């Protein structure tokens, strides 16, 4: 087990102090509808209220603030499915650095556009996160840019851990946390923080049922590659990296379960958030709600926290989902 999971609560506090001028402490609100549905208090952690519309700003900010002035001056670079790129672009602009974001052609145009608005250089490369990562590594070697990975880095995970700390502070009796699972930065960070304070709390990762790289890797016992598909939960796409050094070990050790939801269930989560919670969520942000609505996670044994991780959905697509239209996605 990697030593990162055993970092002290003081280290989480240092990360929180480091980023507090740049990120919001997001609300944790009770969901009346989900509480009535499950018979258990369900509270929603509104991470989509962050300045860039997702939790990713925490880790990106924590990482860039620990670079030397000379490294910041040369610039930062990352591969991204959208939200990390937007967060890193925002954080770079805030400290006077420049960002280059490499993405595949699966990233929705609305996310690409928002990154460009923040002044970042955008490179669209290939049809997978792995293709984008190859371009990142090329530019690191050629231009001396500092790579800020989207999830598999101790500074990123430490920033995301502050979400877990805030959940426990706001809900001391938390018995279960549901959160989106992709590369594992959020899941590893939140799980480590919550279990440090509430060892018996269950942490459930939720992801889409097509191209679930972390689940496949946990089942195999080592990182594996999976095919990427278009999905309502587009920001959960991409692999975990065959040389994954941090999040795979932590997720395998700290997650109590990983649950898969399909496109229809993700759409139902988006609709529920809008109609009953008055929240606009992207697909990845709604997977925890989807898991409860579908009955794939039974909320019992105490209070449940659900992390709503992001809101950066194309509004045309959001209207289609609210109106009951689920776009067909590629099967091969």
Swiss-Prot record:
S-S bonds: none
Leader sequence segment: none
SUPFAM superfamilies given in the database record: Tryptophan synthase beta subunit-like PLP-dependent enzymes
EC number: 4.3.1.19
Catalytic activity: L-threonine = 2-oxobutanoate + NH4(+)
Keyword set includes 4Fe-4S: no
Residue list for modification N6-(pyridoxal phosphate)lysine: 56
Biological process annotations from GO: isoleucine biosynthetic process; L-serine catabolic process; threonine catabolic process
PANTHER family: L-THREONINE DEHYDRATASE CATABOLIC TDCB, THREONINE DEHYDRATASE, MITOCHONDRIAL-RELATED
NCBIfam families: ectoine_eutB, PRK07476.1
Protein name: Putative threonine dehydratase
Source organism: Sinorhizobium fredii (strain NBRC 101917 / NGR234)
């Amino acid at each position: 087990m990697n030593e990162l999971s055993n970092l002290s609560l003081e280290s989480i506090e240092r990360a929180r102090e480091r980023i507090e001028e740049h990120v919001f402490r997001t609300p944790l609100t009770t969901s009346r509808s989900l509480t009535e549905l499950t018979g258990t208090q369900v509270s929603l952690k509104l991470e989509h209220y962050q300045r860039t519309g997702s939790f990713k700003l925490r880790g990106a900010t924590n990482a860039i603030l620990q670079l030397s002035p000379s490294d910041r001056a040369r610039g930062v670079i990352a591969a991204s499915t959208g939200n990390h790129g937007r967060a890193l672009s925002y954080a770079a602009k805030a400290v006077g650095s420049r960002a280059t974001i490499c993405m595949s052609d699966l990233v929705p145009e609305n996310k690409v556009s928002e990154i460009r608005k923040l002044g970042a250089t955008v490179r669209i490369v290939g049809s997978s996160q792995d293709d984008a990562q190859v371009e990142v590594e090329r530019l690191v070697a050629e231009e001396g840019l500092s790579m800020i990975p989207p999830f598999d880095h101790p500074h990123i995970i430490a920033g995301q851990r502050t979400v877990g700390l805030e959940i426990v502070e706001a809900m001391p009796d938390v018995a279960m946390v549901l959160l989106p699972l992709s590369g594992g930065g959020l899941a590893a960070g939140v799980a480590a923080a919550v279990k440090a304070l509430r060892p018996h709390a269950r942490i459930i990762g939720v992801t889409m049922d097509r191209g679930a790289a972390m689940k496949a890797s946990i089942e195999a016992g080592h990182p594996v590659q999976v095919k990427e598909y278009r999905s309502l939960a587009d920001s959960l796409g991409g692999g975990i990296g065959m040389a994954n050094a941090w999040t795979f070990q932590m997720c395998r050790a700290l997650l109590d379960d990983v649950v898969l939801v399909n496109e229809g269930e993700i759409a139902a989560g988006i609709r529920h958030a809008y109609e009953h919670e008055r929240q606009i969520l992207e697909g990845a942000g709604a997977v925890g709600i989807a898991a409860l609505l579908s009955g794939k996670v039974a909320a019992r044994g105490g209070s449940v926290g659900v992390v709503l991780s992001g809101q950066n959905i194309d509004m045309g697509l959001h209207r289609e989902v609210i109106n009951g239209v689920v776009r067909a996605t590629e099967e091969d």
